[in-house]
Amino acid sequence: MKKVKRIDMAIHVQELCAANYISVAYQPLSQKHPKYWARRDVRKIMIRPTKNTGYYVSALHEIGHIVGKFQDRSQLTKELWAWVWARQNAIVWTETAD
């Protein structure tokens, strides 16, 4: 299996956001605890810079909250389907995300 470079993951996140008119705010890596979020009403996500595959799939999950199915349902349904969207659109995945 070909290893996906960090830059390719970062570019993929940016391309998805651009294609879906999503603005991105980045949480500094100096902040110890990640604070990811998505705001559908303003099409904006907060993510950490794409430092590794875990950060990448988390970014895709937040994008999934904007463009994924069933984001007007219960919190559990929204979370599940944001992960489904992330998995379906990822160029690489991490076993810990399963």
Identify the role of each PLM range.
Residues K3-R6, Q14-G54, I66:
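Active-site scaffold of zinc-dependent metalloenzymes
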Residues P49, F70-R73:
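A short glycine/serine-rich beta->alpha loop
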Residues M1-D8, A86:
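A short, highly charged nucleic-acid-interacting micro-segment common to nuclease
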Residues Q75-D98:
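Post-HExxH zinc-binding segment in Zn-dependent metallohydrolases
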Residues V57-F70:
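Active-site recognition of the HExxH zinc-binding catalytic motif
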